[in-house]
Design a protein with these regions (language model features):
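Membrane-embedded translocation segments of transport machinery
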Residues: 3-8, 12, 170, 174-322, ...
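Helix-loop-helix connectors at the membrane interface of multi-pass transporters/channels
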Residues: 5, 79, 112-141, 242-245, ...
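Inter-helical loop and helix-membrane interface segments of multi-pass membrane transporters/permeases
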Residues: 6-9, 38-42, 77-96, 109-166, ...
Length: 458
């Protein structure tokens, strides 16, 4: 019976398909929208340095562990966890991993909708309009237009998933990722060559210990979850579509390099441009999530070729958002397929309904429903907090415990070294998965919850 189930499962065509799809999953709004504003806020170069160190240790370990578990079991998170025993704890660990993408994809698609709106306006030549004060807040508080943009983004994502792993995800990733790289280079060069931009390059690339604080580490850890799509059920799901002859270690290295390179490029696209525009004014650097939708249009409006830059930039952001939203949606769909024994069509429809329902709440949370607050947050911010700060650290701890206590690191090593494949960072992996990863995840969990309730300020 096992044999039959295995053969029916779809798969990536090979290493390139897997790497570009996994990199597509991990290169998303997290890299282009979240990374630069965190780097700007938490001290530039020192943040970047800590981020890279964490990606090579913590990030690497979690990617290897999740991919290996997916490939060993050939199942999405719930089934993968439950393959190792019947306990309630195991199935809870699986479900936490599985529910995260179901909650992220709706609000992610809302932000994707904002990106579509900005792109359309740039194509129409309305760059100056986008740069006007108050444009962004007026736009997001108008429920109808955000809802339409959100629906377009959500339906496009669902259409790709409907087409399947090879025809949908892999094909789109193979098309979009190379374009994404080229665009990020073009925009970074454009940004760095503006007058006054070099100060920004220096701030972003040169670590300055003066800017270091404990929060730099916590922020870099939180960003890594986002950025490498750890603890979202995605890598377990993608691992289950990965062929046995593809090296897990090599693929992980490729994904890490790809992901970190794009995050650095995004920093080079955004931070120097902000410096050129504002002369490194601390308030502009602290703009946070608004950096991409408020500051960047102002920067483009003040420079030559602003409209062209705006179009290229938002095409890039849109591609990054789509490659990630299809990974999140795939993860959700595969859970329903595996657990409810549904066909793909039915599972896509169910996920679509959830997406439109929860996403509409996030859209309306800035407009007609702005009076509703969950622990003082609007819907979108609340879903972001719940998934990124609470559930993902718990999911990561569950994965670490699964590997160290239930599956055993030996079995993971065997899976990674299947065939001719190497596992050079075996020692780092063992120490990280047993001790450091769960501790790091617990620190993120505790500090972000304490921050949300105002016990500490980050």
């Amino acid at each position: 019976r096992m044999k039959m189930e295995h053969n029916k499962r779809s798969s990536f065509s090979g290493k390139l398909g897997y790497v570009l799809s996994a990199a597509g999953a991990s290169v998303g709004l997290g890299n282009i929208w979240r990374f630069p504003y965190l780097a700007a806020k938490y001290g530039g170069g020192i943040f970047l340095l800590i981020y890279i160190l964490l990606a090579l240790t913590f990030g690497y370990t979690m990617i290897v562990a999740e991919t290996a578990i997916g490939r060993m079991t050939k199942k999405s998170p719930v089934g993968a966890f439950s393959s190792f025993g019947k306990s309630k704890w195991l199935s809870a660990g699986g479900w936490i991993n599985a529910i995260i993408p179901v909650l992220i994809v709706p609000y992610y698609s809302v932000i994707g909708g904002w990106v579509i709106k900005y792109l359309v306006e740039y194509v129409k030549g309305n760059g100056q309009k986008l740069a006007a004060d108050g444009y962004f807040s007026d736009f997001i508080s108008n429920g109808t237009s955000t809802e339409i943009c959100f629906a377009v983004f959500a339906l496009f994502t669902l259409a790709i998933i409907y087409a399947g792993v090879r025809n949908g995800i892999e094909r789109v990733s193979k098309f979009m990722m190379p374009i994404l790289i080229v665009l990020s280079v073009i925009i970074a060069v454009y940004s760095v060559t503006r007058p006054g931009a070099l100060e920004g390059v220096k701030y972003f690339l040169v670590p300055n210990v003066k800017n270091f604080s404990w929060m730099t580490v916590v922020a870099a850890m939180g960003q890594m979850f986002y950025s490498l799509s750890i603890a979202m059920g995605i890598l377990i799901t993608f691992g289950s579509y990965m062929k046995k002859d593809v090296s897990i270690e090599d693929s992980t290295r490729n994904v890490e390099v790809f992901d970190t390179a794009i995050a650095i490029m995004a920093g080079l696209m955004i931070i120097p441009a902000v410096f050129a525009f504002s002369g490194g004014d601390p308030d502009t650097l602290q703009a946070g999530p608004a950096l991409m939708f408020i500051t960047i249009p102002k920067v483009f409006a003040s420079m030559g070729f602003g409209t062209v830059a705006g179009i290229l930039f938002f095409v890039l952001v849109l591609f990054a958002a789509i490659t990630s939203s299809i990974a999140l949606t795939e993860s959700a769909v595969s859970t329903f397929e595996d657990e409810l024994h549904w066909g793909r069509k039915k599972a896509v429809v169910l996920v679509g309904v959830i997406m439109l329902g929860l996403g509409t709440l996030s859209c309306m949370g800035y407009g007609p429903l702005s009076w509703v607050k969950l622990i003082g947050m609007q819907f979108l911010d609340f879903f972001d907090f719940l998934t990124n700060s609470v559930m993902m650290p718990i999911a990561a701890i569950a994965t670490c415990l699964l590997v160290s206590k239930v599956v055993g690191t030996k079995s993971i090593e065997e899976e990674v070294m299947h065939g001719e494949s190497t596992f050079r960072r075996k020692k780092i992996f063992n120490v990280m998965i047993r001790y450091l990863c769960p501790i790091f995840a617990a620190i993120i969990l505790i500090s972000s919850v304490a921050n949300a309730f105002g016990w500490i300020s980050m």
